[in-house]
Amino acid sequence: MSDNSDRRLIEEYLPIKAISTEALREKSVRKGHISTLHLWWARRPLVACRAAVYGALVPASRFVPENGPDNKKQSLGRANAAKFIERLCKYPGNPTVIKEAQRHILEAHAERLTEETGKKVSVEDIEEGRAPRPKVLDMFAGGGAIPLEALRLGCEAYALDLNPVAHIIELCTLVYPQKYGKPDPNARGMTGPKNPKGETTWGGLAKEVRFWGEWVLKKVNAEIGDLYPLIPDPDYKGNRPAVQTEMWQSSDKESIPPGYLMPVAYLWTRTVRCKNPSCGATVPLVRQTWLCKKKDRYVALKMVAPPGEKQVRFEVVESKTEQGLGFDPAGFSKGGNATCPFCGTVADSGYVKAEGQAGRLSSYQLMAIVCTRPGKQGKVYLSADDTAEFAPDDVAISGRIEALSARTGLPVPGEPIVTDAKNSCWTHLYGLATFGHLFTPRQMLCLLTFAAAVREAQEQASRLYHSRDGCHPERAKAVATYLAVLVNRQADKESTL
């Protein structure tokens, strides 16, 4: 082949509009998509990467008919290519079409190998390992979309990236599923059938991760479950058991005793001292207090300023219409300015930032607790003033954090948050200068407890995966990596931001 005769399909034509349409549809897919594994800010659509890899490895002449008028061959070739690529680039993908695409790539690769080596190379030679597969290198792999699609199309893929987050994502997306994804009767595990020695074998990566994930949940529940107690149902009329202090897992709702609610969210607001020196009240920095906006059910928190006091109360107000609430739940802090509910003084954004820089923006006020009622749909909203005894004790929790850090060596994250204009999240303007500042004491204790449990799970797995044939620390490391990614996702959702 001459250089001109080996022009690739991507150099001549790809149905960009059709690929873009499918990529847009793929973007809305959440369940089972690799983008849900871990946040990466430069995710590439899988279908677009599939088209790019296929187009880069298949010759431009692949779909050009051999017979017919020369002036029509090019247009016919483009039409044929468009039809096939539109079938190929569907998410998640048709296995039959993908297999056909693999054949196209291997046929082209076999032809190139034949010319390069001077020996006849067939597709069967490549499939059976007598000749190498086409190699695809992505030097800036990021979320791993291009290497993943290269693997899907039967290539040998290599992924590089200097960013450690990208490296973790690539391990979980590309490496570990290939090495440990399938059940292995020759390796120790916790979820597979027992071998002749009576040892439990490796049941597959997904099952092992689920097993150890449940192990971590049980351990964390035993350590900090008392901080998330069940709450007595104010509408329950029957006899209820003694007050429960243990947190029931949401997957085990049948075990929740009658007369209790399961807390699923605690709603907080940051506060600042009133700008008026003669007032000095605590001003909530909350923009809106909507809890529910559904047909025939409108629920919001009403801010009440009791005379003679310095802290507001939040009352749960419910109505069948928005007007029936009697107040505007969205009429609070606006544009970074907060109005004192006691004296009406406006705390502008500059004042709020100055208070934060002085370290006086680290106090919170619990507004409400959101619960579920076992066996029933919908949420139950309870005012914090009606459930004050169930609010966490920050002083006691801080002591538990110190004890946990001393026992495990896991400190509260003190790394500074980047402050340059390009990458900053601007929290430093409010005095939140380290990652540890972004969490309440209970959130921090929860995250540290999970981190410690994941570390212990890896140690336990390394011991249990040990066999007479040798230790398998990499399998335990793979499981722990997925669990660590889940803790990271938890940190994204459970912060004060």
Task: Describe each region flagged by the PLM.
Residues 1-497:
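S-adenosyl-L-methionine-dependent nucleic acid methyltransferase catalytic domains
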